[in-house]
Amino acid sequence: MRVRDFLENGFHLVAGDGGLENPIEGVYICDLLSWVMAKSKPKNAWITIQSHVNIVAVALMVEQSCIIVSEGVEVEREAVERANEEAMPILSFPGTSYEAAIKLYQLLSK
């Protein structure tokens, strides 16, 4: 599965369209950036409610496939700009992180 596949299933692209072909092998859900850096794995879709520019730096450091900002949280302009520069996809999801995780589980289990 690739980031692009999520766009047809309730997720909306906010930034980083240069990374839409990134492969996704798993999902990680966390809002504490230091915890994500320590525990997440490369090629994960990272679900968070954080929306500031530092999420892009963390996602790049851990080699995430994309960032999914749940709860309909608006992503800050600086984060959008940085994600576009780095080709790190940021997707939005209107539901809870739990609902996003269920949706991703269903998609990745196909």
Model-derived regions, located:
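Active-site rim beta-loop-alpha module in soluble metabolic enzymes
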Residues: 30
